Amino acid sequence: MAYSIYVIELKKEVLKHRKFKEANPNYIPGKPCVYVGYTSKTPEDRYEKHKAGTMISAKYAKKYGFRLKPRLYRVHNPMSSRKEALAMEKEKARRLRNRGYGVWQN
């Protein structure tokens, strides 16, 4: 089974949530806010599930997500294991935070 990471751009309104702001103390105003995840589906399929509300643990992606950002994840996909995808999800989130992005991941 192949796995992928994906990045969903979030509307800036997500910044009004205390938990999101606390998770991103080095956020640079004007930089994108994103949700980073991994999946055994295609990133497009997973995005549709988020928007349909079937991903309970990803409320920010459902409420504030408005598009995929393939240029931020395409180079990493596909991966051969869940473990590899989870590690890459964490690494991608770390890298984006280091660039001043607002990032949410579960």
Regions found by a protein language model. Give the residues of each.
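GIY-YIG nuclease catalytic motif and its immediate N-terminal context
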Residues: 1-48, 80-90
